[in-house]
Amino acid sequence: MNELLLNLVDPLHQWFLGLGDGGVVLWSVLKILLIAVPVIVSVAFYVVWERKLIGWMHVRHGPMYVGMGIFQAFADVFKLLFKEILQPSSSHKAMFIIAPLLTLAPAFAAWSVVPFDAKLVLSNANVGLLYLLAMTSLGVYGIILAGWASNSKYAFLGAMRSAAQVVSYEIAMGFALVGVMIASGSVNLSQIVFAQAGNSGFFDWFLIPLFPLFIVYWVSGVAETNRAPFDVVEGESEIVAGHMVEYSGGAFALFFLAEYANMILVSFLISIFFFGGWLSPIQGWVNADISPWIDWLWKGGWPWLLMKVFFFASAYIWFRASFPRYRYDQIMRLGWKVFIPLTIVWIAVTALMVFYGVIQKGV
């Protein structure tokens, strides 16, 4: 299946290169659109799936009218885009508009180094992991700026909570990825996936030797995206909507889009770092060439990556419907007193496992 897709892309690539420098620029723009447009569409369907799944968990139907509810998210988008963006009279006008853009830009920029397959990646950067850490850290500046520019007590309190929470869990996430870097011997995301390849299927994935780091990264990813049960940044019962309390229309839609794009991104990264990315869980167990349409089941391919992402994206919704919101002090305690010490210890354990050959770096 991967070969079929590449056979369609390569002739198009060569045609653009034949146009000279302008063709190179157009090809770069096209690649950006090939990432941005699917992410935006995925967010729309993700919102529908969230409403549907939570409805089932609440013993309700969820969205069910007008195309089984599929078009509800698109209707919400058009509704928000055509609404007026109201600004408080005492707000900082320029910063008020810049803040949602500053939140959205890193959420989309991070996708440039995410590999969907061995050859399907926008930029196969050798410092992809470091680039991701940098991009995912920048989004909080938009939230802080929104809280300050709104000139609202609720917005400012939400922004301060977000700053403390993101900084706290960014450390734990970074330490967890240090373990992945040690196990794979690379900071290139494609090489991290190749390091999990082998003839033992899912037993070669980093999930097993790095299981504590997987749990830390998963929970920290939920906290990093300000989702339940770590959504004190926009806790409705306390500070209404936090940093977004004064936003409406298209500006609010940008915050919403950035949040859900980050949720999908974290789901991709968990799948790549700990679940073998596009690798098949039965890779090496079956050796047969039948048809490109089904060979990916045991050879691996982007459909496996999407299935893993779907599971973790659905887990976000499960968390929201199942767990009560943590208190702010409980969130800080979990990050600083549990996750950070645990990751430091397991980094040392990972180094020992690599030194003694317990973790093999691919085939």
UniProtKB/Swiss-Prot annotation:
Any one biological process term the GO annotation gives: aerobic respiration
Root EC class: translocase
InterPro entries: NADH_UbQ_OxRdtase_su1/FPO, NADH_UbQ_OxRdtase_su1_CS
Topology term for the membrane: Multi-pass membrane protein
GO MF terms, alphabetically ordered: NADH dehydrogenase activity; oxidoreductase activity, acting on NAD(P)H, quinone or similar compound as acceptor; quinone binding
Location of this chain's protein in the cell: Cell inner membrane
Reaction catalyzed: a quinone + NADH + 5 H(+)(in) = a quinol + NAD(+) + 4 H(+)(out)
E.C. number: 7.1.1.-
GO cellular component, one term: plasma membrane
Annotated keywords: Cell inner membrane, Cell membrane, Membrane, NAD, Quinone, Translocase, Transmembrane, Transmembrane helix, Ubiquinone
Membrane-spanning intervals of the chain: 29-49, 62-82, 96-116, 127-147, 163-183, 202-222, 238-257, 278-298, 299-319, 339-359
PANTHER family: NADH DEHYDROGENASE SUBUNIT 1, NADH-UBIQUINONE OXIDOREDUCTASE CHAIN 1
Subunit structure and binding partners: NDH-1 is composed of 14 different subunits. Subunits NuoA, H, J, K, L, M, N constitute the membrane sector of the complex.
Protein role: NDH-1 shuttles electrons from NADH, via FMN and iron-sulfur (Fe-S) centers, to quinones in the respiratory chain. The immediate electron acceptor for the enzyme in this species is believed to be ubiquinone. Couples the redox reaction to proton translocation (for every two electrons transferred, four hydrogen ions are translocated across the cytoplasmic membrane), and thus conserves the redox energy in a proton gradient. This subunit may bind ubiquinone.
Family: Belongs to the complex I subunit 1 family.
Designated name of the protein: NADH-quinone oxidoreductase subunit H
Organism, as annotated: Xanthomonas oryzae pv. oryzae (strain MAFF 311018)
